Curated annotation (Swiss-Prot):
Species this protein is from: Sphingopyxis macrogoltabida
Role according to the record: Involved in degradation of fumonisin B1. Catalyzes the hydrolysis of fumonisin B1 (FB1) to aminopentol (HFB1).
Residues forming the catalytic site: 240 (acyl-ester intermediate), 356 (charge relay system), 448 (charge relay system)
Domain of life: Bacteria
One GO molecular-function entry: cholinesterase activity
The protein's name in its UniProt record: Fumonisin B1 esterase
Enzyme Commission number(s): 3.1.1.87
Length: 540
């Protein structure tokens, strides 16, 4: 990815005060459907419509959507606006509204890195951003369809549930209810601060973005029957930071019963996490007066944070803004939890792309052997020589491939290997994949994020302009691959296995290391795409 059923009647009563109690205390073929809403760019507001045609009732009030082969409901609040005194607090219950809310337009995206919401159909950004969107097959009943909830990536610094390539229409046409949502990121989503920890009944702060995710999952549990979904058949799926968050939540007791299955696309697992005290020290860089910080303009606050808190990625150091070991949401490193079997033993589908790292390293000022060695020293210190032996570059021409492999393995592939080994050890159902894409003139090998338009079966103009894997436009081979890949994802959500009714047999990943490859050919085999780190682990 380029740097990247109920009609009429009375509304149900508002959610009780104990809502989210555990958290609040702290192109072409029919398979590829473009059904974007015309004019879906304005901010949604609560409105009394004269003649609502498609209405569903949530616990907070009625919502009007858009009718069609896929019924669409946009901009539904799953939590109260996290503004004012609710800034840097766990998400509070959504406020009830009178009349029928207009659910035909996207709500604002959360404030964050603007580059990460390129193409978004939302009208700008706002701190008031905790909204979700639903795509459901034309209603034939209530509460019987599997649900797929998408968690977008963005390095925990931004993103949007309203970009076109996350449109859920094509997947919904295959018989599932699709949900996307926004969550707080960056300084607004992950600030830890001593004053915030002091005011928390759990004595912690930070991880508000993760709590937003859990709140969205909880809203789905409480309301999705009204949109045709079954709250007992929920598959969460995400990419990059979204997948990383889901992997971390597998180890959190707060995620119990929040979802039934998970799909992790290029997760960044087995990375260091800051402790609460380390993160609180970062937070103090913004100032000691939390009341003043709550009154500050959110956009300006984000800019100040970016100038005062280093945001560059360090392989061996925790993210300056992202999930932390707070002792409440996250209580142990995922490495330790997976080793001990202290994770939710639910079916998981996980994988990555052939050239994960290049999406990041193409922009690095590392082009010569000397620059490469300096980069290794900066990242790994005394272990730089060991890492260079694992990822050698004997000439300047070797450097781009070496640094891309290093980045892809250390940031993505190694964690996937760790998760896979743990699931095999604890005999927990897991399926592995590797996305290679469709070769073509001007196309690079599939890198980070390139699988997304194929998973969503969205190969329209927005995806072509955004993803290098679609350079030159989507052809027949791309359409075929998107059909097969999206069918596998839906099969997993519907049947609990990714090959029910599909063309290719996809065996479970066990100790032999079976992996499904999605590319010019789709098929499974042993040891495909296994990270070089299995034979070369310089830190061991």
């Amino acid at each position: 990815m380029k740097e990247h059923q109920c009609r009429g009647g009375r509304a149900s009563p508002a959610a009780p005060a104990t809502w989210l109690a555990r958290i609040s205390v702290s192109r072409g073929a029919s398979a590829i459907a473009w059904t974007f809403m015309l004019g879906a760019t304005a901010i949604p507001v609560a409105a009394q419509t004269d003649d609502p045609k498609l209405v569903r009732h949530t616990q907070s009030g009625a919502v009007e959507g858009v009718e069609g082969d896929v019924e669409t409901f946009l901009g539904i609040p799953f939590a109260a606006p996290p503004v004012g005194d609710l800034r840097w607090r766990p998400p509070a219950p959504p406020r009830a509204w009178a009349g029928t809310r207009d659910g035909r337009r996207f709500a604002p995206d959360c404030i964050g890195n603007e580059r990460l919401r390129e193409g978004s159909r939302a009208a700008g950004t706002s701190e008031d951003c905790l909204y979700l969107n639903i795509w459901s097959p034309k209603q034939v009943g209530k509460g019987g369809l599997p649900v797929m909830i998408w968690v977008y990536g963005g390095g925990f610094s931004g993103g949007s549930g309203a970009v076109p390539y996350y449109d859920g229409s094509a997947l919904a046409q295959k018989g599932v209810v699709v949900v996307t949502f926004n969550y707080r990121a960056g300084i607004l989503g992950f600030l830890a601060h001593p004053a915030l920890s002091k005011e928390s009944p759990n004595g912690v702060s930070g991880n508000y973005g993760l709590l937003d995710m859990l709140a969205a999952f909880k809203w789905v549990q409480n309301n999705i029957r009204e949109f045709g979904g079954d709250p007992n058949r929920v598959t969460v799926f995400g990419e990059s930071a979204g997948a990383s968050a889901l992997g971390l939540l597998l180890t959190s007791p707060l995620s119990e019963s929040a979802f039934n299955q998970a799909i992790l696309q290029s997760p960044g697992l087995a990375r260091p996490l800051a402790t609460l005290s380390e993160s609180e020290a970062n937070g103090l860089e913004l100032g000691a007066d939390i009341s003043a910080l709550r009154r500050a303009d959110a956009g300006e606050l984000t800019k100040i944070a970016q100038s005062r808190i280093p945001m560059s990625r360090q392989f061996t150091k925790p993210r300056p803004m992202g999930p932390i070991l707070d002792g409440y949401v996250l209580r142990t490193l995922d490495v330790d939890a997976f080793a001990k079997g202290a994770f939710r033993k639910i079916p998981v589908l996980v994988g990555g792309n052939a050239d994960e790292g290049r999406a990041f390293t193409d922009r690095l000022p590392v082009k010569t052997v000397l620059e490469y060695r300096a980069y290794l020293t900066e990242q790994f210190g005394d272990e730089a020589d060991a890492w260079e032996r694992c990822y050698p570059a004997n000439s300047d021409a070797d450097v781009p491939a070496a640094v891309a492999r290093l980045f892809g393995d250390s940031q993505f592939n190694n964690g996937i290997e760790l998760l896979s080994a743990a699931f095999a050890k604890w005999r927990t159902p897991l399926w592995r994949y590797r996305f290679t894409g469709i070769p073509g003139a001007g196309r690079r090998p599939a890198t980070h994020g390139d699988e997304i338009p194929y998973v969503f079966a969205n190969l329209g103009p927005s995806s072509v302009s955004m993803f290098g894997s679609l350079e030159g436009g989507a052809g027949a081979s791309d359409i075929k691959l998107a059909t097969e890949m999206s069918a596998a994802w839906v099969s997993f959500a519907v049947h609990g296995v990714p090959d029910q009714g599909t063309k290719s047999h996809w065996p479970r990943f066990e100790r032999r290391g079976e992996i499904m490859t999605f590319g010019s050919q789709v098929g499974s085999g042993e040891g495909l795409g296994v990270s070089p780190s299995k034979a070369c682990q310089p830190s061991k």
